[in-house]
């Protein structure tokens, strides 16, 4: 890891505490932003640099293309994830490899300790907030897992503010 991104004390008790790598804090926290963008979780590159959707990571390159197509800059979004540490799929010779989807217990812990307080602090806890969920885990987490992904793709959903605090 090239950045001091050790897990804070509030991560203790998380089912992924001993498995997860690094700790990736939100980008543009404390800055005025137009929308929040929430992904599944950091990958290896993001964990190494402590930056969500790092521009040199596959997901970061995709996000850069999306934002460019929408004529938006990274600075216009609060960029974060539903889990804030990298969840490697396996370990080979002690080295983490790949990515795995977070469990519901990991999502619940990270949301209650990190994401939900962040959204409230940044003003994204009301029904007029604009939040973009990227991927199935983030979408399921924010919509309480109701329905299939096809129901949500390319659409806007109203999420009760009580589900965001």
Protein language model regions, located:
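A polyanion-binding, active-site-adjacent surface
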Residues: 1-165
């Amino acid at each position: 890891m090239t950045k001091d991104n050790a897990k804070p004390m509030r991560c203790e008790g998380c089912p992924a505490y001993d498995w997860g790598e690094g700790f990736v804090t939100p980008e543009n926290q404390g800055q005025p932003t137009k929308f929040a963008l929430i992904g599944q979780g950091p990958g290896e590159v993001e964990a190494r640099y402590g930056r969500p959707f790092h521009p040199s990571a596959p997901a970061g390159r995709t996000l850069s293309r999306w934002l460019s197509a929408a004529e938006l800059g990274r600075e216009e979004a609060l960029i974060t994830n539903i889990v804030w540490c990298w969840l490697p799929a396996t370990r080979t010779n002690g080295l983490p490899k790949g990515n795995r989807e977070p469990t519901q217990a990991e999502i619940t812990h990270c949301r209650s300790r990190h994401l939900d307080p962040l959204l409230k602090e940044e003003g994204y806890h009301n029904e007029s907030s604009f939040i973009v969920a990227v991927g199935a885990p983030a979408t399921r987490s924010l919509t309480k897992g109701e329905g299939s992904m096809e129901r949500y793709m390319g659409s806007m959903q109203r999420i009760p503010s009580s589900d965001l605090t």
